[in-house]
Curated annotation (Swiss-Prot), chains A, B:
It comes from Aliarcobacter butzleri (strain RM4018) (Arcobacter butzleri). GO terms for molecular function: histidinol-phosphate transaminase activity; pyridoxal phosphate binding. Gene3D superfamilies: Aspartate Aminotransferase, domain 1, Type I PLP-dependent aspartate aminotransferase-like (Major domain). Homodimer. GO terms for biological process: L-histidine biosynthetic process. This is Histidinol-phosphate aminotransferase. The lineage of its organism: Bacteria, Pseudomonadati, Campylobacterota, Epsilonproteobacteria, Campylobacterales. Its EC number is 2.6.1.9. The gene is hisC. The modification N6-(pyridoxal phosphate)lysine is found at residue 226.
Length: 367, 367
């Protein structure tokens, strides 16, 4: 059967390995498997959110309120926006997919950093767009500017802070860059890990309302998957001027998040104390990683997220390290598919991190 | 800002009104609102599934197993297929979206019945495809054949049984039609309500394995939203030859269903007794609708689903009837947007149906 030609050039996203797979393939008991691979919140979901979902589980037969009135209202209040500035997605992933489908077609141009969230490129290829990347691994706005002057772009992706590397642009630099961008270019500011970055360094904080008021061609994306501990529930949001939101809405399918996801997100917004507590612990534990990696003589990228990227240089092969850890029930993310000889490790709970250090010692001794 | 031109012609799907909206707009207590508008299973979700989700609610922070190994394995066993014949979607809606994006681009042709599931056309317009519809409201395969000979088609949609009208093609007629279709045309057999149709009349039963073995250009879509009582959890599936599945997989985003949706679907498949019991009650109650409508002198379309379409002819205006019912806390689906002077009513529980008859009597007397 014939399919669209653009699909020939499309690869599928390599998701982090689930605990179930390690159980199946290596026969390790699920309670002995530690997953530090998908930047899930290791402290679990807020007990208040869990209780709410247990109470509402009986509503699984009912479609969600597709207007998402209550969630949009809560987000609008928190971020000082109008509901008409908001669209909800099945993870913020889905909203970046909407952006690409709304703006791009074959031979449209999409500008991004060399090593950034893989879905930008994958979604771009779905519509046959041309992907333009900087030479630098990390976000380098001078290179972005040069490439933009040379090629133009229908969409620019800025991942602030950047997944999978962890670095983060300063807000002021982002603003200076945005001033130079044509109003017909949609700039996607992916803030999936913004809560972490803003906690660590106020200079990194992007205020969504100020961003979209100052730059009407920008859209801010946020998620409940990381700081809000709802990775499994697939809820993200986009904030932009209503003209953009209206066009994205044309692409959104009805009922694009589940009834329980909607309820969980609404409840999670009520428990900011839990969120802040998790973020605080995250950076306490990250110090241990920085010390460990330095002691071992490897390099790491200073991180503004809930993960850290450890580079093995010419000492070890990251793919082998990740595989040996996997066989011991420790799942981390090998970055070979991102052309990095590095692993990305989610900052876990204290005892999980201690275990990671032990297993990494053991694995490296035997490689 | 400029957006893709095809979006100018895109309208958004009008979802059934949620209970929350009636509570907000008419100040009616949520426990007094009855929703017979979205073909949700009125008997709720299986208690076994509810218990499982309450147990697993703590896993909301974890991404799902993106291979969906266990769910695909269970579906493969039930339908005598291989896992490689299966793709899971956020509702079967999402899989029909995948089909359109895999096969169609601007000016591709999509053939469908005049009055059928609205998303076929909406997704088609997202890619700028040409929508070709039969003159007959209900599925008429002779007209499909004539139009196919005249125009060809990249995709043909057959909704068996048909939403929102309720009629259902015979399996043998579908097979005769499929024999005449070119192998490069993808035929989507949307079986969202097949469990109901097959229960009522064996001649309507489509066996997915036999369908895709006989016609390698066909894909069968099923859902957990209707008979399996998980409308709010957004889980559907597509069965096809692996060549088709592989291409749809290129378009699927990772983690396209939630962790709890995956668990709920797996558990729901284990409780077929609940499903059969609900379907049996559905057709018992449908008899009451047929008697009521006949007594009132209206027409209905004999239905192979969990809803019934009631036509008001020149006696009443369906939009007014639906609105007056809404103000009394009874939500039904007005079909004006489908160009029908009719309402579609989900077959509810006995007491809900009794209430609908009472309120409809009251409303019609005052119109």
């Amino acid at each position: 059967m014939r399919f669209n030609e653009v699909l020939k050039d499309v690869s599928t996203y390599e998701a982090g390995k689930p605990i179930e797979l390690v159980v199946r393939e290596y026969g390790i008991d699920s309670k002995d498997v530690i997953k530090l691979a998908s930047n899930e919140n290791p402290y679990g979901t807020s007990p208040k959110v869990i209780a709410k979902i247990q109470e509402l589980a009986k509503n699984m037969c009912l479609y969600p309120d597709d207007s998402m009135y209550e969630l949009k209202d809560a987000l609008a209040k928190k971020y000082n926006l109008e509901s008409s500035n908001i669209i909800i997605g099945s993870g913020s992933d889905q909203i970046l997919e909407f952006c690409i489908h709304a703006k791009c077609k074959k031979d449209s141009k999409i500008l991004m950093a060399k090593t950034t969230f893989a879905m930008y490129e994958i979604y771009g290829k779905h519509v046959g767009a041309e992907i333009i990347k900087t030479n630098s691994e990390q976000h380098n706005l001078e290179e972005f500017s040069e490439l933009y002057k040379k090629h133009g772009a229908d969409i620019i992706f800025l991942c602030i802070p950047n997944n999978p590397l962890g670095e983060c642009l300063d807000k002021n630099d982002v603003y200076e860059f945005l001033k130079t961008i044509d109003k017909n270019t949609l700039v996607v500011v992916d803030g999936a890990y913004q809560e972490y970055a803003a906690f660590k360094d106020e200079k990194k904080r992007i205020c969504p309302k100020d961003l979209i008021d100052t730059f009407p061609n920008a859209i801010y994306l946020g998620t409940f998957s990381k700081a809000y501990s709802l990775g499994g529930m697939r809820v993200g949001y986009g904030f932009a001027q209503n003209e953009i939101i209206q066009n994205l809405y044309k692409i959104r399918a009805p009922f694009n998040i589940t009834t329980l996801s909607l309820a969980a997100a609404i409840e999670a917004l009520k428990d900011e104390e839990f969120v802040n507590d998790c973020i605080s612990k995250n950076f306490e534990e990250m110090k241990r990683y920085e010390e460990y990696v330095t002691k071992k003589g490897f390099e790491y990228i200073p991180s503004y997220t809930n993960f850290i990227t450890i580079k093995f240089g010419d000492k070890y092969v990251s793919k082998e390290v990740a595989q040996k850890l996997l066989e011991r029930g420790m799942i981390v993310r090998d970055l070979t598919s991102y052309k990095q000889n590095a692993i990305r490790v989610t900052i876990g709970k204290p005892e999980q991190n201690t275990k990671l250090f032990q297993l990494l010692d053991e694995v490296l001794q035997n490689l």
